[in-house]
Amino acid sequence: MAVKIRLKRMGAKKRPFYRIVVADARAPRDGRFIEEIGYYNPVSEPKEIKIDGEKAEKWLGNGAQPTDTVKYLFKKNGIIK
């Protein structure tokens, strides 16, 4: 099973926020996921990012592939270098 760490869109029209989730690569963007590891709110000022570093490192160690956006958020939070 190919596992991705990606963003799940939530919120209202024109006011999105995102949950950072671990999901099967074949599942729909907003569909079934395995575990939630954080959230990202780009609308608030300043932008809110909260990631559970232990869970993220566990999934990265198990071979989960982060998407480009999630990789950027991980770098910003110091989870990956």
From Swiss-Prot:
Transmembrane segments: none annotated. InterPro entries: Ribosomal_bS16 (IPR000307), Ribosomal_bS16_CS (IPR020592), Ribosomal_bS16_dom_sf (IPR023803). Keywords: Ribonucleoprotein, Ribosomal protein. The keyword Ion transport does not apply. The keyword Ribosomal protein applies. GO terms for cellular component: cytoplasm; small ribosomal subunit. GO terms for molecular function: structural constituent of ribosome. One of its GO terms (biological process) is translation. SUPFAM superfamilies: Ribosomal protein S16. Pfam families: Ribosomal_S16. HAMAP family: Ribosomal_bS16 (MF_00385). Belongs to the bacterial ribosomal protein bS16 family. NCBIfam families: S16. This is Small ribosomal subunit protein bS16. It comes from Alkaliphilus metalliredigens (strain QYMF).
